[in-house]
Amino acid sequence: MAEQNIDDILSNSEKDTKKWYVIHTASGAENRIKRIMLERISKQKMSDFFDDILVPVFGVSEVKRSKNVKVEKKLMPSYILIKMNMTDKSWHLVKNIPGVTGFLGSKTTPKALTESEIQNIRLETEAKEAKDAKLYEVGEIVTVTEGPFETFTGTVEEVDQEKARLKVSVSIFGKATPIELSFTQVKKND
């Protein structure tokens, strides 16, 4: 497909369908920019030019103060995905938002993403969430990293995601003994 400059894209876009574009933003400002963008689209009555604005995030479990906490992480920090009809007016609306540094592509040619690329991003987000959903699984081998059983290897018998705790069976004097540990007291064996 031949490269088009921004003028060609803008002049032909009235008849084009909406396409996905990637906007580069200031780091950490993605949600604020999305909010401002939605306000400006509404205020300027341009909702016909825009379909969707995505800041791809996934949930991850982190252990903080011995508690399992769900935290949102950005899949693509400093980037926003936007499905829009690229016209001169819509291009300027996006480009003039404070914190937007530009569209992905060259200065004169914003690069449109394919639907399959967008689908891959959505699948990657889902995969990261599914992977995180089970930090530890029953039957998994772990090593105790702190406490009186440090360096002992055992098998996970129970997992309590809410309390961030495990019941691990370790061998003490040749006898399998269950001990309760926090997620921070063990590490997975590779």
UniProtKB/Swiss-Prot annotation:
Keywords: Transcription, Transcription antitermination, Transcription regulation, Transcription termination. The keyword Transcription applies. One of its GO terms (biological process) is regulation of DNA-templated transcription elongation. It comes from the Bacteria. One of its GO terms (cellular component) is cytosol. Residues 138-166 form the KOW domain. Pfam families: KOW, NusG. InterPro entries: KOW (IPR005824), NGN (IPR047050), NGN-like_dom (IPR006645), NGN_dom_sf (IPR036735), NusG-like (IPR043425), Rib_uL2_dom2 (IPR014722), Transcrpt_antiterm_NusG (IPR001062), Transcrpt_antiterm_NusG_bac_CS (IPR015869). Belongs to the NusG family. Participates in transcription elongation, termination and antitermination. HAMAP family: NusG. This is Transcription termination/antitermination protein NusG. The lineage of its organism: Bacteria, Pseudomonadati, Pseudomonadota, Alphaproteobacteria, Rickettsiales.
